[in-house]
Each structure stands twice: as structure tokens, then as C-alpha cells.
């Protein structure tokens, strides 16, 4: 695991894109043409633990499927922005609603629609297989590819740095 070169004690909120970050960058389609997503169980556990431990969490994605909304809502994520055509607008809405400052936010994105959000937050994270333009501006490039544990990688590092990883909420769903 590589280490993040940022003061992780500042992070109070995690925001993730879905396609290419929390799910692989390939999307299988049902016979009806409905996109389906695969998600990483360890990412889910880390997201849930972060929620239970008091961190702010949000999803900002261009996609819009009930399965994605339901999955992340069940993990405890309240702020889910679907069909986000201009992601920086949703980041600003999230900050206005929650009061988080840019330097308190970690955002992970993988492609050009994430560019402006990644420039606006304190800690920008890219999966190992992100677009070159995104890797160029990311403050941390995970050793994990999209859908293979990016969220777990960064949440675990932040929570360990803050002494909240192995807390009493860590031993159950």
C-alpha cells in the first residue's frame, strides 16, 4: 500500500464517483439495455464503517440506476447525486448543505468529468487505471484499479491516521 502525502487528520468527508472508481470501468448491460454495476465488498465495508464513525460521505456520479442508489443508501450514505452533468455544482451543493470546507474533503474520480472537482478539494485521489489527465492532477494515485478497492485503500489510510479504523463500530455491519 502506498501512503498518501497529505495531512490526513484534516479529512472529515469522502466523496466518490461510481463508474471507474467504486465499480470497474466496464459496464455489463442487461437484455433490456439496463446498465449493471459490480461493486467491491471491501469498499462497501469501509464506506459503511466511515459512515458509522461520523465521517461525511457522498456519491457524485453521472449514472442513474436504482441499484446504485439503493446500494449506497443501504451503506448509510445520505448524499447521493445521480445524473450529475456538472459535478462541481454538486460538490458545491454538498459543501453548502454540510458545511465541509474543501480541505476537509477527499474526492476520488477517474475521468474528465471529475477534473474540476478534483482541483477544488483538499485531497484528490485517482484509481490506478484513471485517465492520464486525472492522474496528472491527483494528489494520490491508488495502487488499486477502479472497482478493486480504491475506497477501502483511502478510507483505511485516513481512519488509521486519525485513530478511528479499529474502533468499536468496526466489528459488524
Language-model-detected regions and their locations in the chain:
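Short secondary-structure boundary segments
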Residues: 18, 62-63, 84, 128-130
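Short coil/turn segments at beta-strand junctions that form active-site/ligand-binding loops
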Residues: 10-12, 55, 103-104
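Mg2+-dependent phosphoryl-transfer enzymes with acidic/Ser/Thr/Gly-rich catalytic loops
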Residues: 36, 79-80, 88-173
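A positional/architectural concept
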Residues: 22-53, 62
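Asp-based phosphoryl-transfer active-site loop
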Residues: 9-27, 118, 151
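Non-catalytic pre-domain segments flanking phosphatase-related domains
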Residues: 1-18, 161-173
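Substrate-recognition element of Asp-dependent hydrolases with the DxDx(T/V) motif
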Residues: 47-71, 81-82
